[in-house]
């Protein structure tokens, strides 16, 4: 059942379009109210329904749909504070932490927060961040790693505390400002100020260093961990990638191909990387053993521009602004093609318990059935 729920007031709201009318059914305190508003056409009624749903989300209602089909949202929560480029979130057990840009408080101090949700979408807590701008958030071993304006912090939910890794590891700030975090299999590898660390079983170990080339004054840096966290793919130069042993930083191979500048990579399996070209947003596959590069084979759209993508357990989702494609990597078939709600230009996406989780630039956090 698709309904809007307000956990604070206890109100439940169901919206539907019947013929050319918007029908609202509200339940609160054992009482039911129904209203019906006629429109000139079905399309106008549908637009009014979408508008009413969005207005309700902004008032604190949460959309839940227990009967969502493939490509449909099972959850919408209005977070607000969307900042293009910093739409980070991550999940730990039954909790989801979503970054919210809070602008400025009185006195000019930043008020950026982590919004903690449970799986029903209820907001359980709002946690003040020690620094603004959470560019990325990843989970490892029940901890949250945060890239806060290019400095890495670890948030420990059980202790409700932030660990400042810069101070812990005595990392000296340098001109190497580009940073990264990637996680898999309860481990994480992160880099800041030219130094690479692994975080595993609560311990932090330095495993290497990096130096970024630049393209149009922008540092080249992206990284990915293999599913078993044994390999780190690292790109710091145009047309060049390194595969490192993620445990000790040993260079396993150096790959050179005409892929240009990359801004996102991920492992599809232990032998294949998915690459996104900087600015062009085109996707390519790279064979790690042969360094052979091929165009993505799944989506038959020469105009495809991948604003976002994510892969997990044999599934890949590619997003072009608000258009999403879910792909079965084993068969190579597109399982579903659907439109994401509440996206203006971009979003961040990850898999959470088999569902597609999306944080949009319009201020929403959603789960979609895949």
Question: Can you describe what each PLM-predicted range is?
Answer:
Residues 83-90, 130-141, 170-185, 215-224, ...:
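Repeated scaffold domains used in trafficking and secretory/extracellular systems
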Residues 73-82, 122-128, 161-173, 205-215, ...:
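A short beta-strand motif characteristic of beta-propeller blades
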Residues 9-35:
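Short aromatic-glycine-(Arg/Gly/Cys) micro-motifs in beta-strand/loop hairpins
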Residues 96, 144, 187-188, 232, ...:
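Hydrophobic beta-strand positions that form the internal "hydrophobic ladder"
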Residues 118-120, 156-160, 200-203, 245-249, ...:
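Short loop/turn segments that connect beta-strands within beta-propeller blades
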Residues 78-112:
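Beta-strand-rich domains and repeat architectures in extracellular enzymes and scaffolds
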Residues 104-111, 190-191, 236-237, 278-279, ...:
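Short, solvent-exposed loop/turn segments at conserved positions within beta-propeller repeat blades
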């Amino acid at each position: 059942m698709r309904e809007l729920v307000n956990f604070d007031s206890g109100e439940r709201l169901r919206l539907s379009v019947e013929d050319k009318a918007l029908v609202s059914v509200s339940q609160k305190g054992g009482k039911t109210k129904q209203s019906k508003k006629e429109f000139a056409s079905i399309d106008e009624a549908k637009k009014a329904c979408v508008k009413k749903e969005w207005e309700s989300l902004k008032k604190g209602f949460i959309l839940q749909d227990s009967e969502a089909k493939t490509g449909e949202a099972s959850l919408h929560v209005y977070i607000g504070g969307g900042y293009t480029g910093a739409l980070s979130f991550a999940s730990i057990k039954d909790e989801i932490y979503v970054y919210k840009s809070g602008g400025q408080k009185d006195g000019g101090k930043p008020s950026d927060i982590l919004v903690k949700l449970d799986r029903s979408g209820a907001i359980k807590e709002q946690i003040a961040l020690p620094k603004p701008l959470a560019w990325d958030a990843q989970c490892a071993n029940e901890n949250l790693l945060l890239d806060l304006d290019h400095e890495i912090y670890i948030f420990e939910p059980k202790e409700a505390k932030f660990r400042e890794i810069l101070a812990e590891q005595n990392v000296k700030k340098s001109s190497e400002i580009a940073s990264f975090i990637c996680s898999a299999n309860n481990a994480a590898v992160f880099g800041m100020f030219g130094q690479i660390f692994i975080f595993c079983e609560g311990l932090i170990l330095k495993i290497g260093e990096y130096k970024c080339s630049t393209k149009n004054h922008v540092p080249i840096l992206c990284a990915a961990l293999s599913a078993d966290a044994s390999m780190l793919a690292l790109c710091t130069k145009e047309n060049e990638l390194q595969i490192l042993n993620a445990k000790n930083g040993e260079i396993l191979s150096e790959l050179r191909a005409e892929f240009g500048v990359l801004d996102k990579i991920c492992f599809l399996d232990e032998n294949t990387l998915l690459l996104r070209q900087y600015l062009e947003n085109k996707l390519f596959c790279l064979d790690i053993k042969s360094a052979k590069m091929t165009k993505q084979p799944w989506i038959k759209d020469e105009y495809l521009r991948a604003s976002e993508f994510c892969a997990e357990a044999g599934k890949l989702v590619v997003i072009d602004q608000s258009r999403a494609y879910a792909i079965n990597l084993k068969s190579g078939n597109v399982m579903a093609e659907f439109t994401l709600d509440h996206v203006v230009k971009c979003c961040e996406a990850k898999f959470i318990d088999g569902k597609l989780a999306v944080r949009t630039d319009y201020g929403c956090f959603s789960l979609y059935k895949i």
